[in-house]
């Protein structure tokens, strides 16, 4: 397969919110469609924790992207109409500078010497990409999961840079349940003896810790309703079971194992730790004197769609309502969409049947509306 990624060298030094700075840092991104002469048809997508910038296929890289059925010619994010941009998060190992990158000061990987990462840093790096393309205002900023929090930071830190926003299954701050789950995921990685304080290699790799972390994640990304419908209490065939005490016996256990096996070596453990903690730290209330509502009221956009799903236990529907109410109080025209999907937090990735009409409909209405001058 080809590689459609492009790279932007960030300003050097690049200051980080929680202290420290990066030198010679860069971020990876991909684009689809054509930027029009007025440069007012750009749509930026910010991702969850683990995806790359490869949102959908293109001529340079025809492999399916992580949102393949949502973006492309004639799809909800119609690249015949919109100039779509997807940025790989700063701190991710999918092409951007991250803990696995070489520190130019030492020639060795940063590992745990990488500065503390905040989602505000992710937002600032994404804004640098947009600015480098000569775009002063995005037609729409779409943020999914962790990327939704990064999107809120983007709009707060760069007022007037976004016309409309689509918030997808995200939150204005992490609730205790989400923090607790991510804490267990990080603990599983750190307690793997091969993690070795962040110093590992392919021969000595924290496979077990990453596997447990992924399994915990998958459990929170879906819903009990889906588990019951798909697996019930169905057991594995005898030849599929593990021949050891307390080994895998139920189909749901095998499903989790398969997910973990496919993920373990595809994402750097230290990057996982950094982005996971950044998700815990983000709190829009910091921008509203301790109030989530007042923090959201500082965001100045024309209109927004806030989408949530009733079975999401990681970012509950009530948090989507908070975002909708706050943006509306700030003066935006807000559409709140509560979807009834059994697939939980991951519904935006798999329940395209419900998400696509909502997102595509909003973008169609945005395209038909006159663009104001801020």
Give a label for each model feature.
Residues 137-179:
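Conserved hydrolase catalytic core segment
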Residues 1-45, 59:
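Catalytic-loop region of hydrolases
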Residues 30, 35-103:
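N-terminal cap/lid subdomain of alpha/beta-hydrolase-fold enzymes
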Residues 322-324, 328-374:
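Catalytic active-site module of serine/aspartate enzymes centered on a nucleophile-bearing elbow/loop
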Residues 161, 167-262:
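Alpha/beta-hydrolase-fold enzymes
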Residues 107-109, 113, 120-139:
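Conserved acidic catalytic loop of the alpha/beta-hydrolase fold
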Residues 306-308:
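Short beta-strand/loop motif that positions the catalytic acidic residue
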Residues 287-293, 303, 316-327:
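Short alpha-helix in the alpha/beta-hydrolase fold that links the catalytic acid
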């Amino acid at each position: 397969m080809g590689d459609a990624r492009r790279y932007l060298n960030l300003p050097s030094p690049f200051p980080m919110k929680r202290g420290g700075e990066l030198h010679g840092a860069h971020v990876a991104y991909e684009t689809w469609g054509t930027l029009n002469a007025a440069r007012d048809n750009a749509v930026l997508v910010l991702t969850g924790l683990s995806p790359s910038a490869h949102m959908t296929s293109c001529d340079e890289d025809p492999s399916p992207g992580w949102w393949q059925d949502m973006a492309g010619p004639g799809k909800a994010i119609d690249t015949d109409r919109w100039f779509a941009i997807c940025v790989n998060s700063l701190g991710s190992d999918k092409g951007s500078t991250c803990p696995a990158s070489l520190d130019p000061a030492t020639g060795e990987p940063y590992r745990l010497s990488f500065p503390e990462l905040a989602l505000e840093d992710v937002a600032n790096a994404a804004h640098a990409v947009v600015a480098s393309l000569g775009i002063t205002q995005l037609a729409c900023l779409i943020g999914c999961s962790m990327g939704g929090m990064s999107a809120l930071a983007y709009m707060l830190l760069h007022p007037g840079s976004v016309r409309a926003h689509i918030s997808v299954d995200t939150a204005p701050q992490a609730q205790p349940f989400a923090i607790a789950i991510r804490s267990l995921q990080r603990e599983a990685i750190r307690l793997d003896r091969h993690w070795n304080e962040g110093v590992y290699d392919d021969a000595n790799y924290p496979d077990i810790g990453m596997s447990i972390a992924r399994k915990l994640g998958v459990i929170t990304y879906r819903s009990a309703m889906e588990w019951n419908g798909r697996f019930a209490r169905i057991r594995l065939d005898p030849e599929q079971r593990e021949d050891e005490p307390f080994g895998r016996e139920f189909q749901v256990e095998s499903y989790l194992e398969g997910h973990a096996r496919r993920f373990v070596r595809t994402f750097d453990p230290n990057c996982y730790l950094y982005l996971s903690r950044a998700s815990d730290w983000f709190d829009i209330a910091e921008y509203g004197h301790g109030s989530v509502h007042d923090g959201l009221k500082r965001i100045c956009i024309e209109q927004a769609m806030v989408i949530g799903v009733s079975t999401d236990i990681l970012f509950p529907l009530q948090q989507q309502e908070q975002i909708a109410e706050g943006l509306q109080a700030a003066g935006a025209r807000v559409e709140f969409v509560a979807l009834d999907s059994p697939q939980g937090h991951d519904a935006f990735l798999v329940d395209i049947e419900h998400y696509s009409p909502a997102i595509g409909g909003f973008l169609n209405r945005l395209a038909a509306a006159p663009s104001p001058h801020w």
